[in-house]
Amino acid sequence: MPPAHPRYAAERSDLRDRLDAATARLDPPFGVVDLDAFDANATALIGRAGGKPVRVASKSVRSRELLRRVLARPGWRGVMAYALTEAIWLAEGGVSDDILVGYPTVDRTAVAKVAASPELAAAITLMVDSVDQLDFVDAVTAPDQREPLRVCIDLDASWKLLGGRLHIGVRRSPLHRPEQTGALAAAIAARPGFRLVGLMAYEAQIAGMGDAPPGHPVRGAALRRIQARSLRELIGRRTAAVAAVRRYADLEFVNGGGTGSLATTTTDPSVTELTSGSGLYGPVLFDAYRAWQPTPAAFFATSVVRRPTPDIATVHGGGWIASGAAGADRLPEPWLPAGLHLLGTEGAGEVQTPLAGSAAAGLRIGDRVWFRHAKAGEVCEHLDALQLVRGDTIEDVALTYRGERAPAFL
């Protein structure tokens, strides 16, 4: 019996029929979330977390309505925001009273607003990795003239070899060794106006790197070996860093992991909570994971507007490219109907995208082609709303950040 996954031809055909029927009165471009897939992914992610709570990564959702939907489910607790201005907007909108800003901030207006509000100061935790950031905050608002600010230390989770000459992972925090983390904890504890409540270590080389890249089995096997060794190293170092920090503060949480590493990060006894977001929408990049692949749940529709040749169909738009190192894996994928691909010489275009493949000849002017974005929340930068589909019916409409006319957080 084949897995219940829309990558299989019959199920993809059924999905196309359902989405076309549900949105028949809408004109592309527009976005859709398949609620059955979204909810199933939310449940599966909690199952992979092994009993630890999961904080939802807002950058991978970018819709307050869908964030509320996730947080109403068992196992999900709190938000990881990507900007302090966003965290304020989410808190004031009643999305959550537990928001961790995943990155340092130098937004003076936002810092001053949090510092002046007992409610915001209690709900929002700032990220720091250096004394310079503490100095910046103090320059904005004096310690004796503000609410105590909650802070979390960001530990570098990358794997360094050969004395640091070989770096595997991303360039985030300068704090790599436990003693460095402990030193910052001591500095925070000695300063008025701050309260150290958490530690975070995001293992991007495990959580954000697919270990089964299509067509590259040797590379995949090598990645899995590297990831396993990196995880072993990180568990020991993160445990030591947590111990060093706990000498100066009674931590409320130790955060780690992402969609691609929930099942492994949860095995680290020093970690008390996890983070996930991309797995809710199931974007293309997560097709390259072996242990678990989310069911595709988010799509955007385009229309066929021309037929330059009998075997090519061209859609209007389509070029919604993902961030990160430039490459083919950042392109959106034409998903429905099955049997379409981008042209290597043109890719996904700003205004039009030609498509070839076995399904191209059967497409007519006005037909729809459904794409999946390479990443998750970034698709919402192009959309005012997401049509929430269940079966072949639009059950509701969720505004995106853009649709709510939110400030430009990034």
Task: Place the predicted regions along the sequence by residue.
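Active-site-proximal beta-alpha core segment in soluble small-molecule metabolic enzymes
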Residues: 57-203, 208
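Glycine-rich tight-turn/loop motif centered on a GG-T
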Residues: 23-34, 97-101, 119-126, 166-175, ...
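Hydrophobic/basic alpha-helical segments enriched in Actinobacteria
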Residues: 21, 26, 30-31, 48-53, ...
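Active-site loop/helix belt of alpha/beta enzymes
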Residues: 157-282
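A charged N-terminal "starter" segment
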Residues: 1-116, 404-410
